[in-house]
From Swiss-Prot:
It comes from the Viruses. Residues 389-401 have a biased composition (Basic and acidic residues). This is Uncharacterized protein R635. Residues 376-386 have a biased composition (Polar residues). Residues 376-408 are annotated as: Disordered. The lineage of its organism: Viruses, Varidnaviria, Bamfordvirae, Nucleocytoviricota, Megaviricetes.
Length: 408
């Protein structure tokens, strides 16, 4: 009766002559030959479907490892599998060649890591600290990514590729790449939460800057560096007027048109400077417009403003013979210039320049002869030329009717 209970399947008798128990035990498994002698039980007393851990010895690499009999099949040695397990034996050449220590790139493995390259599989996704031999910085990445970038010869160091800045104040490389190395740092506002030492000089993120006149504005370091003399008194007014407090966007469009004409003429070297532009640096111009709003100081151009005649535009300036000088826009400024430079100033040349660069009531436009359909449209009371939006350009409309020209 007791023998029947032992061989019932719940308990194995361990007798190799008992076919019933032998076929249910691990001794009947083909991998029973890898059973380690360190186990306290023999495979005849262990069930094939046992979930307990037992020790095995691989016949190929001779490593000892633990496994459960219910999962023993095919290749079950973790040391023989790719990037699975590495032993700690320094004399094991098989595990050494599978570890990251056998790779030439292991020289970049930082001493800040707790694990050694000998204990980490090659091309694994384990993250660690690497030391850049170019800049001396330590950065974190996975071993697989580090090897991949070196194979395609790309810079992986975030400090060499200018993706990160370190916090070391004595690091010359990061200081040179930061905005703190630029002379424009003197305009960095204390309202910013970050230090310019921690911001790239080519950053496109907007920060607060303070001009010498006390005006604060937001701009990116890249735009600040690429701009010329943006901190100048007159350029500051230009920036304030065009970017921050501009209530009339059409003025900014006229200014862009003016710059496009200047750029086109510079390419063929036909630019001439107006001789009396320096005198205008100290004159505060008012906005010339019929739009009711609080006037803001208009900007003046600096040192190399181009002549409207040289640019190829007429400026919509009426002759001084048909219009009294006192009725010309900008006559009060002409009197100031005349008092400084004398009476030998070309009146038409001055007002042409004034209408092109200062008087935005007369925007820069080119002219051509009107067609018959355009003349009819101009005379039509329901035409767009007679709409309320064009009331502030009444002088221009009269001039267009008289000279037979149209704005294009």
């Amino acid at each position: 009766m007791e023998l029947e209970n032992i061989c019932s399947g719940r308990v194995l008798c361990g007798n190799s002559a008992c076919e019933k128990c032998f076929h249910k035990s691990f001794a009947s498994h083909p991998y029973a030959k890898y059973w380690s002698e360190n186990n306290t039980e023999s495979p005849e007393f262990v069930n094939l479907k046992s979930a307990s851990y037992f020790e095995f010895k691989c016949g190929e690499c001779h490593h000892l490892f633990s496994a459960r009999p219910c999962y023993v099949q095919n290749k079950f040695c973790p040391y023989c599998l790719d990037v699975k397990k590495i032993c700690v034996d320094k004399n094991c050449t098989e595990c050494y060649h599978k570890s990251f220590a056998s790779d030439p790139l292991s020289i970049f493995w930082s001493d800040l890591n707790e694990r050694r390259p000998r204990h980490i599989p090659k091309e694994s996704h384990i993250r660690g600290m690497f030391n850049c031999h170019e800049c001396g910085h330590n950065f974190e990445t996975s071993i697989a990514v580090f090897i991949k970038y070196h194979k395609i010869r790309q810079i992986i160091c975030p400090y060499c590729s200018e993706k990160m800045l370190c916090r070391d104040k004595n690091c010359i490389k990061c200081l040179t790449a930061s905005f703190a190395s630029r002379p424009e740092i003197v305009f960095w506002s204390s309202d910013n939460k970050m230090s310019p030492r921690h911001i790239f000089k080519n950053s496109k993120v907007n920060y607060i800057f303070s001009c010498t006149c006390g005006f604060k504005f937001t701009q990116s370091p890249l735009c600040i560096i690429s701009s010329t003399k943006w901190w100048d008194r007159h350029d500051c007014k230009k920036y304030e007027y065009l970017k921050i407090e501009c209530e009339k966007p059409q003025y900014f469009e006229d200014f862009e048109h003016y710059l496009s004409l200047v750029s086109a003429q510079k390419s063929i070297n036909r630019i001439q400077s107006i001789p009396y532009i320096d005198v205008f640096d100290d004159i505060q111009f008012d906005q010339q417009s019929d739009i009711q709003s609080e006037p803001s100081p208009i900007f003046t151009t600096t040192k190399s403003v181009e002549s409207a005649d040289d640019i190829g535009t007429s400026g919509f300036t009426e002759s001084s013979e048909s219009t009294p000088l006192s009725d010309q826009p900008g006559c009060e400024y002409f009197e100031q210039i005349e008092s400084v430079l004398g009476p030998d100033i070309d009146v038409d040349h001055f007002f042409s320049w004034y209408n092109e660069t200062v008087n935005y009531n007369r925007p820069l436009k080119r002219q051509r002869q009107m067609t018959a359909s355009e003349i009819n449209e101009l005379n039509d009371p329901n035409s767009v030329y007679n709409s309320p939006e064009f009331d502030h350009q009444g002088d221009q409309k009269k001039l267009t009717e008289e000279n037979g020209c149209v704005v294009q």
